[in-house]
Swiss-Prot record:
L-glutamate binds at residues 492, 494, 499, 668-669, 719. It is a multi-pass membrane protein. It holds the Pfam family Lig_chan. This is Glutamate receptor 1. It comes from Mus musculus (Mouse). Glycans are attached at residues 63, 249, 257, 363, 401, 406. Ionotropic glutamate receptor that functions as a ligand-gated cation channel, gated by L-glutamate and glutamatergic agonists such as alpha-amino-3-hydroxy-5-methyl-4-isoxazolepropionic acid (AMPA), quisqualic acid, and kainic acid. L-glutamate acts as an excitatory neurotransmitter at many synapses in the central nervous system. Residues 857-881 are annotated as: Disordered. Gene3D superfamilies: 1.10.287.70, 3.40.50.2300, Periplasmic binding protein-like II. The lineage of its organism: Eukaryota, Metazoa, Chordata, Craniata, Vertebrata.
Amino acid sequence: MPYIFAFFCTGFLGAVVGANFPNNIQIGGLFPNQQSQEHAAFRFALSQLTEPPKLLPQIDIVNISDSFEMTYRFCSQFSKGVYAIFGFYERRTVNMLTSFCGALHVCFITPSFPVDTSNQFVLQLRPELQEALISIIDHYKWQTFVYIYDADRGLSVLQRVLDTAAEKNWQVTAVNILTTTEEGYRMLFQDLEKKKERLVVVDCESERLNAILGQIVKLEKNGIGYHYILANLGFMDIDLNKFKESGANVTGFQLVNYTDTIPARIMQQWRTSDARDHTRVDWKRPKYTSALTYDGVKVMAEAFQSLRRQRIDISRRGNAGDCLANPAVPWGQGIDIQRALQQVRFEGLTGNVQFNEKGRRTNYTLHVIEMKHDGIRKIGYWNEDDKFVPAATDAQAGGDNSSVQNRTYIVTTILEDPYVMLKKNANQFEGNDRYEGYCVELAAEIAKHVGYSYRLEIVSDGKYGARDPDTKAWNGMVGELVYGRADVAVAPLTITLVREEVIDFSKPFMSLGISIMIKKPQKSKPGVFSFLDPLAYEIWMCIVFAYIGVSVVLFLVSRFSPYEWHSEEFEEGRDQTTSDQSNEFGIFNSLWFSLGAFMQQGCDISPRSLSGRIVGGVWWFFTLIIISSYTANLAAFLTVERMVSPIESAEDLAKQTEIAYGTLEAGSTKEFFRRSKIAVFEKMWTYMKSAEPSVFVRTTEEGMIRVRKSKGKYAYLLESTMNEYIEQRKPCDTMKVGGNLDSKGYGIATPKGSALRGPVNLAVLKLSEQGVLDKLKSKWWYDKGECGSKDSGSKDKTSALSLSNVAGVFYILIGGLGLAMLVALIEFCYKSRSESKRMKGFCLIPQQSINEAIRTSTLPRNSGAGASGGSGSGENGRVVSQDFPKSMQSIPCMSHSSGMPLGATGL
């Protein structure tokens, strides 16, 4: 029962909602002219609708450039309860319309020029033209051209073209002709003629475009050599007969393809319709704006039909509202209509009609039309995915190799080590046999795989290929291909965008990048105290402080702990009732114990108390880890001679000024830094272009010589392959540091559309997969190198230590021995002076006593004495005699009073 009840409730609510959906939908219309073709197309489209709901128009004729009148008409229609408004705008009124639509949630469907807005309630029927226009300019390889535009339709297309021009280094002259008079047109084209500007883009609406083209014909700027690109979607709407007769080249875009099935059917219905409000209009070929108007009506019809099927209530019961209210009250159902409009998709007069989340056309196709002296033809199409796709030609490159084998091809190249070099005895050979090198063998391998005969020819000007900025002519090997003087270029020719526009490249046969060449630094010899290098100086300082700290703590612990004190054994004759306590860990013994433990040699005394043993244990653990770590690193530091390079990367170069750096004066490396937007490379370019003296060199050889003679004060930036090759050439004093700054490749070039492109490309891929390319590079870079392998000889140098590696240890040994002898002398002198002062009289010390003093300080005790007896205890715990030396106890002395010799008891 609950399910049945819910089912009936749902059905009842759906019926109520469906009943509330209006059968008649009021829609607004704002048109600039009642007799316009767009107005008639609007009426015709409404007459073709058969499914409910019925769309009832509220049409106003308005001056679309007058903001006040547009505001009044817009608010008037909104107050009448329209659900959506169809209309046109201009630059002066577009901001007002988008503002009202966003505030009131009223949808505005327009075929006017697209605007860059985030307002989702403005549905733009006209596709955007920016990307398609840029693709066509790229297709024709324009570098310098004039851009004529009408500011009334906005500046979005111009802004996109200027941004691209900055990226691709185009030279664009923008001219606004909004207020240009007939005299102004004459002066404009005279000025362009003086500057030899014959490539022109015209960005205007159809009415103004026809006027401009009329002026061009009147001024006779439509002859052979002129090329105009019309940034307009109605190429077939424009009268170009005068251009066809005079020989100018005109290219444009066509949105409506009248030969397609749907446009042809609709056009037939349009012509045969007997609707009274559009019989006075010529329907032979409607303008593209009229086609957009027709599709706009269908968009609204599809959206409201979808809302009706979904039973969404959009009725405006008492919700007409006031668009001038402050604050503005948005229409609650406006968002539902906006979503329904954006979800519409169908095939219309203008092709696929579909919108993105911003209300702009997407997934559309533009037909590219070209008119020459021989007539009008479609040269391709443009869409968002494929960009510009040229029309198919009869000849397909690479389809048949039979013609390739019937002639001898010219292979242009350049003398550059190790790619192409003259043999030492070249005069004894003829033809291709005079040359050797990487590219010579590569050309032979490719010819073998493709199956053609060839002849190597060195390019006459010795250049790779660049376009002259004044004459626009190509030089070098690229020029040889462009102007048909060569068929293939096999050389270290970098694949770049500007070259790819005029010639075809194969897949890269070698990858490379910009690298840094410096003079190879001398290997750093180990210092006298290199044995200290395994640990940082901070660690050594911490070890010293730890040693002192442990010794002091051990001394204090031994003094405080009662278990560290012990009684001395008594000598004969002493009072045994007196207890004499001793402690072996004085401050000097504590230092000695810590030093012995650190040196892992041990000591003849050890702590007796638990606290003292804890101190000793943690110190032993500490020294175990430190000594083990030191030993592990010692071998590497003593046996390896390092080359300390002052530069390791481009960042190191950029942040210093002591070492100069530069590139080839004219080449792709210099262009890379000039065009780079990366902060580090921009900083490097700023330095290079302002450095005095100049850091640029004319040839790679000059850069190499400058590096070798600069004593490490100059770094040369060049392609990594050449850097690696020079590193293997005598005198072996240069080296490559750091990684590559960019990534590019060398390719084999052929003229545009050459039948060799496909076979050559396949040959390069096959050689790469077979490892032939790697073998060739290894042969000409390393096998024929003059400096040996990078790691050769390193094992012999690291197997034995030289005296310089351990000289510091010997210095410390000698210094320690000398210090010990000096301290012994000081001890002897100090003790002798102390003993002599203690005597109360003038004593004559015989030579025998001196000898005994030098011999030892520990003398045999009396037989009655204990093992450790005596009246005093030394620092190390041994018992010593109070009198030094002991033989002095029997030294005869002269009394001051009697002058008689006295015994020891007389002292």
